[in-house]
Structures are given as C-alpha cells and as structure tokens.
Amino acid sequence: MPQQAALAGHFTLPGTSMTLNRMGYGAMQLAGPQVWGPPRDVAAAISVLREAVDAGVNHIDTSDYYGPHVTNQLIKQALHPYPEGLVIVTKVGARRGADKSWLPALSRQELIDAVHDNLRNLGLDTLDVVNLRVGGFMEPSDGSIEAPLTVLAELQRQGLIRHIGLSNVTPSQLAQGQSIAAIVCVQNAYNVVLRKDDGFVDDLAARGIAYVPFFPMGGFTPVQSSILDDAAASLHATPMQLALAWLLQRSPNILLIPGTSSVAHLRENLEASKVEIPRKVIGDLDSLGR
C-alpha cells in the first residue's frame, strides 16, 4: 500500500513549506474506551501508526488530553525518530477530569503546561502545528479567543510552536485570531449532514487556509444513515468510504483525519480516495445536509 494516502492529492498549509497529503490520520481512537487510559492492544496501536506512515500519511492529528498522554506516547513509541516530512498536529485548550469528563483548560498556565506536555510526550523540541480548541463538544460558541491565542502566539515566538490553527471556532473568531497570529488551519465538525460550515469552508478555500473536519459520520439520523448506506452499496463502497470521499470532493482545502485502532479499517479509509461519486449520488447526498 505504498503512498496510498497520496492518491487523494495534497495541500500546502499557508505561509509554510508543509505540503500534506489530504488523507491524514487522527489518533484519538488509539486510547482506551472513552479516550481514557491505554489501548487494549498496544502492539495493534503501534502497527496502525506505522502502517499509516508507510502508506504515505504525513499528517497525524493528536492531543495530549487523549488518554490523557496516551496517544502522544504511542506516537513517540511507534514513530520516533520521526520521518522527514511527517507533520504532527496537536490541540490544546481542554483537559480530562478524574471522572473522564472533558473540561476547558484555557488559562495561561494551563496552555503553557499543555504545550510542554505535548513536547515531552511526543519527544519534540518544537510542535509543528498547535490548534487552539475552544467552544463546546461539537458546536462553537462565539466569544473572544484573544487571551488564549495570545499565549500561543508568545510560545510561537519562543520557538516552541511553528504554526497555529483553531478548532471548533466561528468565522468571527477566525477573524479575531488572524489579528493575533497567522492561522494555517481550522478544525470543525463537518460532514455530509452537518453543513453549517458550508460557507466557512468556501471562504477558507478562497484564502488558502486548510479546513479539517472531524466526526465524518457524526450527527446522522437513522433515515440519513440508511440513505448513506444505500448510496455506498451502489458504489461498492463502505458508508465511511463514501462519507470521506464526499469530503475530499467537497473542496480542495479539506484535509481528512479519520481515526481507527484497526489496520483493516485504516486500509479501508485510505481506499476512500478511489471512490468516484456520480453527480446524481452527490445530489442525493447534498439533500441530506442541514
């Protein structure tokens, strides 16, 4: 499966030399149940990471609050010293409670500690890209991001961060963010049924900024899932493959980070770049959006 990930094309983050294959990998599912603790099978998790990179994935999404600490430590164990050209994108702005809850962590000290935790657990001196995560679980909440983003900009000037992105944000928050630091990517919930960001995707594409959707199969009703299943079967694809293929065809600035803890599912996801969606099927899928 050499360079399978490259078949989806590539995108260069604005103002950088980082050219990423559009099919990346999200490490969230490598942790244990509820994204807590170690995986049931560490060797399998290591195999998934190594196979992803062998297949041409050069963009891994992670965070030190996955586990916590678990996915970053697995990435280091599997891939360090890192191959040339591999870009590791991490997130800060949240933490895990002792009850496994997801809590905001946006104070100055929490952000500084999070960056240093990521550096230590990934075995890096500088983080390639750090996304500032704000808002709710899946929905952005409009409000000022000046204070936390200013902290990341300071850490960038200190050489601890190369580039900055935003996660779970609104267009107005992006505008505010761009007045503080150069923003190379936006990571929001978006898929064939969650279409609130349609205009945002197009605006970012016009500016040359990457859009990285998470939850490619999230938010489907049973009826919508059934329609997706039928459309996928008609194309001899899995529903996930069709959902990913739709995103790839939606806009050239979209970068994918599907996650899995299975080598078999990793291979299936990478095959999504081969799925060609006829115009009629695209119309059927577009009718699902809300």
What are these regions (language model features)?
Residues 38-52, 106-121, 170-174:
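Short, acidic/polar
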Residues 30-43, 98-109, 138-141:
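Active-site mouth loops of central-metabolism enzymes
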Residues 119-139:
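Active-site groove signature of glycoside hydrolases
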Residues 19-23, 56-58, 83-86, 124-128, ...:
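Short, well-ordered coil/turn segments that N-cap beta-strands
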Residues 59-64, 89, 126-132, 165-166:
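Short beta-strand segments at enzyme active-site cores
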Residues 85-98:
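A short, structured active-site edge motif that brings together acidic residues
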Residues 3, 7-10, 135-290:
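Beta/alpha (TIM)-barrel catalytic core signal, keyed to glycine-rich beta->alpha loops juxtaposed to Asp/Glu
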Residues 1-86:
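N-terminal binding-site loop/beta-alpha segment at the start of enzyme catalytic domains
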